[in-house]
Amino acid sequence: MRRVLAAAMLLAFATSAGAEEAEPPEWVKALRLRGRLAEEFAYRLHDPGDVSKLKTLGWLEGKYAVSEAVSLRAAVRGWYDAVFDATDRYPANVERDQKTDLSLREALLTIGHGDLDVRLGRQQIVWGEAISTFVTDVVNPKDFREFVLPDFSELRIPIWALDFTYRLTEGVSFEGVWTPDTMHNRLPKQGAEFQFARLPYRFRNPVVHLPDDADEFSLGRSEGGFRLSLLRRGWDVSLVYYDQADKSPVFFQRRVAQPPRPDVIVLDPQHPRVHVVGVTLGKSFEPVVVRAEAAYTIDKRYETTDPLDLDGVVRRDTLDWLVGVDYTFFERLDTALQLSQKVLMGSATHLTRPGVAARVTTSLALRLTTGFFDNTLNPTVLFVTGLNRGDFRLSPRIDYLVSGAVTLSVGADLFEGPHQTLYGQFDRNDRVTLTTTWRF
């Protein structure tokens, strides 16, 4: 009996010692890791009906608290889309561009000292949040290879930047941003599932398309701006300014003589400098929340098909604005209604972009969200329409929380309208989707 008791005491002591030895060091306690894995499937409904996405996506992010004032964050994302092995529908340039991806989504040093917060590294800087559009969200370039269908946190392309916020007084803060990371919007290649409609040029001469400039670090072309924010009596108001190169290419034309053959028309993608001045506003009038954004872009350029225009580009300063109202019906149906306009300071005749329907282009968006069975079954419907020409996007989705870590999502993306409109250009790209997500 004594031997058994001694053995039990020895085992308890060894277990206790082992537990003490297994105690993680302090630096491990300060580290937080999380991530997700997703399988994304999409099937195109129109002829030729076929699988359009078989993507396996992984995301891993971590945060390390050096101290109460200093922290480090990092996140990586990668994917492999097996649709390029399952079908030969897409050309080689699209496969190279979209089959695989591995990117650093965040690498951020955050320092807080008194009224000053500094964020240095690769990051997303969000100055505005709208439904299916961007008004004052101008700092980060966007990835449009899947149009605007992914979540906006996935659409934004992170940039290397210095971002600091200084609290001037209670309720008033100043944020400054500077970046040498002059990245452009990432556009789908010709032949991609969501390639944009081609500009409707009608040249009689041969045409040469020059490649776009590569993304680069450049002190001479660096970008920056500021946001001044005020919070008073429930009013959240911000004034923003940003100086940048146009994130989307503008195709300038020039005629090159090559006698005795006909002249060649050269289309040269450029990124002219623009200045954005904007304002955001938010206020809760219980039970209604009102939000508004406006951005005036100076020196904005657009392509034109006017045969008398020598370089094929015109300047049109542009005002983008929106007003939205959020309200919950019956204490369970979250409703967001948004009206937005793009207003050109000049004629829209001969302009060719699908997002410009007239001198004043008006859009209406409606998003409905609710939940059933303790929010384990969550339907969402998003409807966006261009009021000028009646093109629209309809995206219903149902998210089912299988467990605390696993979500199953079923949805669709439906488009309709004339071909040279924002949503009508994808009227043959209607699809149904199925996504399984595991978070850890």
Sequence positions of predicted segments:
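Repeated loop/turn-to-beta-strand initiation elements of outer-membrane beta-barrel proteins
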Residues: 31, 69-72, 115-118, 171-174, ...
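Residues on the lipid-exposed face of transmembrane beta-strands in outer-membrane beta-barrel proteins
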Residues: 39, 58-64, 74, 106-113, ...
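Extracellular loop and loop/strand-boundary signature of outer-membrane beta-barrel proteins
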Residues: 43-48, 91-97, 146-150, 210-214, ...
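Residues that define the transmembrane beta-barrel architecture of outer-membrane proteins
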Residues: 50-56, 100-105, 156-160, 220-224, ...
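Outer membrane beta-barrel
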Residues: 70-196, 233, 415-417
